[in-house]
Regions:
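Glycine-centered hinge/linker elements that transmit conformational signals in sensory
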Residues: 186-190, 224-254
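Short, low-complexity disordered leader/linker segments with a strong preference
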Residues: 1-44, 421-427
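C-terminal capping/gating helix-and-loop segments adjacent to ligand/active sites or protein-protein/ligand interfaces
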Residues: 366-422
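Early extracytoplasmic/lumenal segment of secretory-pathway proteins
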Residues: 42-44, 49-106
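Hinge/lid segment of periplasmic solute-binding proteins
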Residues: 103-155, 293-294, 362
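Immediate post-signal peptide segment of exported/extracytoplasmic ligand-binding proteins
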Residues: 32-45, 63-69, 141-143, 186, ...
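Short helix-initiation/N-cap motifs at beta->coil->alpha
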Residues: 75-86, 103-106, 178-184, 252-266
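Extracytoplasmic/periplasmic substrate-recognition and gating elements
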Residues: 247, 284-345
Length: 427
């Protein structure tokens, strides 16, 4: 096999619901109205995803080779969109897809939804995933509730053409030398914005905060699930993020917003934290824009942002078929193909020595050796933040607090106090 070149497709507009059908679709998902399974008709399994999972080609492959079960993808722009739909229909007791993708940070709350999701434990799948990934999807009773798809080891995406305009190095290795620590990263950014006025250093304050939180062992909760948001590490992240808003390093745009998406086409910023799954998002949003590259570096060492899981809601009509599809989609062979399509790095160690990973390049990112870079970024991760059952809700409050500083509705001190009040209200 020769070198693998990762393809790209334009990302769906944020908040837009797209139902992508591959093959003959005859029914909806687990809302009770679906057909299939009788009179020789195929069962249709709906798979709800968000952002870019790289499943389009896989679904076509499955549907071309299966007459009894067909797959339909229900795709939304962001996890926030998916989350709202998920909890609304969980409360209603019907309407969810047969398979629901869950963002990794939300898994602790999902594990607490007693009886709402099927037990996917299968001894034949022992060892399929990295240990720490499998643990994220396993509840206190030892039941596995989700099958992991990808993981989010992070590097830095950057605009080499804008670096050149600022008189900065553009070579990947030289760029890596500019941002080994957060202090280095911010100092380089201050230099950049002086030389390229009108262009921010990074894409969003919220994205930066997420990147920094991924290096904090206990950002919001202690290991016994006690909420502690007044710890020194979290306050240091807050001060760094809001302080650099005031210095002008941030776009002040909310990640996933329409304005944020549009900024990719307007020289809006020069760098952003990029887990593997973000590469497809960048390439889609920045379609037609030359100059993007991907550096083998992450300030402060390493970090993992995201990664997702496939779950099977118990309210579905075809849970056994859904389990079969979820198993197939998360097998190493399929996740390698998803990586080739969208850059989503597999959570299955058996994939790591595959030539499709080790030789992978990405044409959009100046033929960067993304497989090699992401594999090395994985080795740099030394901290897995503790995420208790309230992590996702507290993170949402933290991001809202940052947004208030971005839009000028509150100064950093007042917004921090509002954050503390909001967290207390969570109970």
């Amino acid at each position: 096999m020769g070198r693998t070149t990762i393809g790209t497709r334009r990302r769906l507009a944020v908040g837009t619901l797209a139902v992508l059908m591959a093959g003959t679709i005859t029914a909806c998902g687990g809302d009770g109205d679906g057909e299939g399974g009788g009179d020789g008709k195929p069962v249709t399994i709906s798979v709800a995803t968000f952002n870019e999972f790289g499943y389009e080609g896989l679904i076509e492959e499955w549907n071309d080779s299966h007459d009894d079960i067909k797959i339909e993808q229900v795709k939304v722009g962001t996890w926030d969109d998916a989350k709202a739909n998920l909890y609304t229909k969980l409360a209603a007791g019907s309407g969810l897809s047969d398979i629901e993708a869950i963002e990794g940070d939300a898994m602790p709350a999902i594990l607490a939804e007693e009886g709402a999701f099927e037990d996917l434990t299968d001894p034949e799948l022992d060892g399929r995933w990295l240990d720490w990934v499998a643990e994220k999807a396993t509840n206190a009773d030892g039941r596995m509730i989700g099958y992991a798809t990808d993981i989010g080891h992070e590097g830095i995406c950057y605009r080499a053409d804008l670096f050149e305009k600022a008189g900065l190095p553009t070579d990947r290795e030289e760029v890596a030398g500019l941002m080994g620590t957060w202090d280095d990263y911010f100092a380089t950014g201050e230099d950049f914005i002086k030389k390229v006025p009108g262009t921010a250093w990074y894409d969003s304050s919220g994205g930066l905060a997420q990147a920094m939180l991924n290096q904090v062992e206990n950002p919001f909760e202690t290991d016994d699930n006690t909420v502690d948001v007044e710890n020194d590490d979290l306050k240091a992240v807050w001060d760094a993020v809001t302080g650099n808003v005031e210095k002008g390093l941030s776009t002040k745009l909310s990640q996933w917003s329409d304005d944020w998406t549009a900024s990719f086409q307007k020289d809006g910023f020069a760098t952003m934290a990029c887990p593997g799954w973000m590469l497809g998002v960048v390439a889609g949003n920045a379609e037609g824009v030359d100059g993007w590259d991907f550096a083998n570096v992450f300030p402060g060492g390493g970090g993992n942002w995201g990664g997702s899981f496939l779950t099977v809601p118990s309210q579905g009509d075809h849970v056994e078929e859904a389990k079969e599809v979820a198993n197939w989609l998360t097998a190493p062979e399929q996740q390698i193909k998803a990586f080739e399509a969208k850059g989503t790095f597999p959570s299955q160690p058996a994939a790591y020595d595959d030539e499709a990973i080790t030789t992978a390049t990405n044409e959009f990112f100046n033929d960067a050796p993304v497989g090699q870079i992401l594999a090395e970024r994985a080795e740099a991760v030394t901290v897995q933040p503790y995420k208790g059952p309230k992590y996702s809700d507290i993170l949402q409050a933290f991001q809202a607090a940052i947004n208030r500083v971005d839009d000028g509705s509150q100064d950093p001190d007042k917004s921090w106090q509002q954050f503390l009040t909001d967290v207390e209200a969570l109970g």
